[in-house]
Design a protein with these regions (language model features):
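NAD(P)+-binding Rossmann beta1-loop-alpha1 motif at the extreme N-terminus of oxidoreductases
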Residues: 1-51
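Rossmann-like NAD(P)(H) cofactor-binding subdomain of soluble oxidoreductases
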Residues: 46-88
Length: 88
């Protein structure tokens, strides 16, 4: 089973959250997003947790960055993602 954290709350994140939620063997542990309104709505829709606080980032096997191209590098470097986790 893959435990997944989805980072972002835009259109791409919405589509990915729906797909992950329907995928057998995958568990969407958390939506991590700076936009509280969209982040909480996306989390509620998919039955998962939401946070915007890096200290609350869930431990997962896979972290999916569904954010703007401009934000990817800075965000990936600033979040406490475990070294053994996969990031896409």
């Amino acid at each position: 089973m893959k435990n997944i954290v989805l980072i972002g709350s835009g259109n791409l994140a919405e589509a990915l959250a729906r797909a992950i939620s329907r995928t057998e063997g995958a568990t969407l542990l958390q939506i991590f997003a700076r936009n509280a309104k969209r982040g909480t709505a996306l989390a509620l829709e998919n039955g998962t947790a939401w946070s915007s606080d890096p200290r609350e980032l869930a431990a997962a096997d896979l972290y999916i960055l569904a954010v703007s191209d401009a934000a990817i590098t800075t965000l990936a470097e600033s979040l406490p993602i475990p070294a053994e986790a996969a990031v896409v």
